[in-house]
A protein has these predicted regions:
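Sec-dependent N-terminal signal peptides of Gram-positive bacterial secreted proteins and lipoproteins
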Residues: 3-23
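Short, solvent-exposed loop/turn segments enriched in Ser/Thr/Gly
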Residues: 41-48, 63, 144-151
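Asparagine-centered strand-capping/turn motif at beta-strand->loop junctions
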Residues: 51-56, 154-158
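Short acidic/proline- and small/hydrophobic-mixed sequence motifs that coincide with surface turns
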Residues: 56-61, 75-76, 161-164, 178-179
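Short, structured motif recognition centered on aromatic/hydrophobic residues
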Residues: 59, 64-68, 162, 168-171
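Short aromatic-acidic-glycine turn motif
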Residues: 68-78, 171-182
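Intrinsically disordered, low-complexity Pro/Gly/Ser/Thr-rich segments with frequent PxxP/GP/PP motifs
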Residues: 76-106, 181-210
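Terminal connector regions
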Residues: 102-146, 205-233
Length: 233
């Protein structure tokens, strides 16, 4: 009897070893950059991050926590809302995340930060990514003044009219560091017909441009994701 029990336990153990692990999505933070921006009317800490699904199932960012610390390690600003631009990430896909917190004490300076992102398996939507072309135009003449813009040309390469197209654009330096993130959306009242293209234009705030100049950094390119979320039946 004992031998039979041992044989059964051994068989169960071997079966457990042989069973493949359940597929799961997994978030990996590839890059996170902290920017402190102070103007006459605000003092904020911005966090720009790039996140990739390195698992083997669809996943979405379900929550996030961002906290900023001063030189003594004391928390000075926080945010618990992660603006994850692409709702559902397929295996190997990435998205950008923006979080920010207000520094209420004007004497404090952001010296360090913590970012925590949580993901969950997502089967409610299918995120369709659309081809896009980007262009960076610095000091573009607007008549009697100039502006700095990121341009994203999006093409609907499907055979149907698409509503609620979203775009996120990341401003990058020579090394690919994220300098700024901005987004735009057609919302549900406007659409892009099959085979057609349209241009999104997003302004780079002058306070960020002044910060790059002070740090000796130069924006050189734009990376963009254009997508539409399609609810599954």
């Amino acid at each position: 009897m004992k031998n039979a029990k041992r044989a059964l336990l051994l068989s169960l153990a071997l079966l457990m070893i042989a069973l493949p692990a359940l597929a799961a999505g997994k978030l990996q933070t590839d890059q996170e950059n902290l920017w402190e921006v102070k103007t006459d009317w605000s003092h904020d800490a911005f966090l720009f991050a790039k996140v990739t699904n390195v698992g083997d199932r669809d996943i979405s960012i379900s929550s996030g926590v961002f906290e900023t610390y001063d030189a003594e390690g004391q928390p000075i600003a926080s945010d618990d809302y992660a603006e994850a631009y692409v709702k559902c990430l397929k295996p190997g896909e990435y998205t950008y995340v923006r979080m920010y917190g207000e520094l209420e004490d004007e004497t404090k300076t952001a010296a360090d930060h913590m970012l925590t992102l949580a993901g969950k398996s997502d089967s409610s939507v299918d995120t369709l990514r659309l081809p896009c072309v980007t262009e960076l135009r610095l000091n573009e003449s607007m008549g009697w003044y100039t502006e700095d813009y990121m341009y994203v040309t999006v093409t609907n390469n499907t055979e149907q009219t698409l509503f609620d197209i979203s775009v996120v654009a990341a401003l990058l330096d020579q090394e690919g560091n994220i300098l700024y993130l901005e987004d735009d959306n057609l919302y549900d009242g406007r659409a892009l017909t099959a085979g057609s293209s349209m241009v999104f234009r997003m302004e780079i705030p002058e306070e960020f441009m002044a910060l790059y100049e002070a740090k000796g950094m130069t924006p050189v390119s734009v990376d963009a994701i254009a997508y539409v979320n399609i609810e599954k039946d």
